[in-house]
Amino acid sequence: MINSILVVCIGNICRSPTGERLLKAALPERKIASAGLKAMVGGSADETASIVANEHGVSLQDHVAQQLTADMCRDSDLILVMEKKHIDLVCRINPSVRGKTMLFGHWINQQEIADPYKKSRDAFEAVYGVLENAAQKWVNALSR
């Protein structure tokens, strides 16, 4: 059974904290965290990401960005990344986790989720919609 899920993006301030919170809301009994491949360590969630998430009832208020580590990878049952190239980057940190590293967009046709950082509000809205859809598909798959 998958009890711990790690959501990964680059900076851990836009996509992964949003994905983490969406999964946490739907799967409160599971341990869900997020981290970044090149995290803005100690930073809070991006302001626009926070505003957009909040408007959809998801709070990123107390998020603190953290750097992905080999131990985090080892201790997670499932690692969800935003882009295909992130799979290789995660595996450079801990090569043993390849079999449990998948795209967050796996259930929506292996869709990659673009980074909205420093882009328009519309970009953040679009990314939120994709994350929400993908998270629901993961919830459905993990609840079987």
UniProtKB/Swiss-Prot annotation:
PANTHER family: LOW MOLECULAR WEIGHT PROTEIN TYROSINE PHOSPHATASE, LOW MOLECULAR WEIGHT PROTEIN-TYROSINE-PHOSPHATASE ETP-RELATED. This is Probable low molecular weight protein-tyrosine-phosphatase AmsI. Its EC number is 3.1.3.48. It comes from the Bacteria. InterPro entries: LMW_PTPase, Ptyr_pPase, Ptyr_pPase_sf, Tyr_phospatase_low_mol_wt. It catalyses: O-phospho-L-tyrosyl-[protein] + H2O = L-tyrosyl-[protein] + phosphate. May function as a phosphatase required for amylovoran (an exopolysaccharide that functions as a virulence factor) production. It is an enzyme of class 3 (hydrolase). The gene is amsI. It holds the Pfam family LMWPc. CDD domains: LMWPTP.
